Amino acid sequence: MGPAGSGQLTKMVNQICIAGLVEGLSEGLSFARAAGLDPLAVVDVISKGAAQSWQMDNRYKTMLEGQFEHGFAVEWMRKDLAICFAEAKRNGALLPVTNLDDEFYAEVEKMGGRRWDTSGLFARLEAKRGAL
């Protein structure tokens, strides 16, 4: 990747991207349910286009089933995001959406989801709209 530290910085980029991506997928699935659409049919269509991602391919079913006891824990994501925020403060990068995502992860922790997979963001949305 480059000089010493480049790999760690690249991991930070990855975590920033995943945090936003998982929230987007959560919002999309919650919206589909709220709109009365079949989320499985929706994913079948959108997974063939620009919205497709590893997270969609590997997490949408467990999200819809309310299964969050697997994968990369919310507490670990928040630890990683704290490292990203410290680096952003140092290098002047702006992370407004990532800051918001971190607030959402904090809410998931308050729901008892500290050890849930990061896709637990979906549970936060469903709880807020009274669907859980």
Task: Identify the residue ranges that each predicted region occupies.
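Helical "substrate-binding/catalytic lid" subdomain
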Residues: 6-128
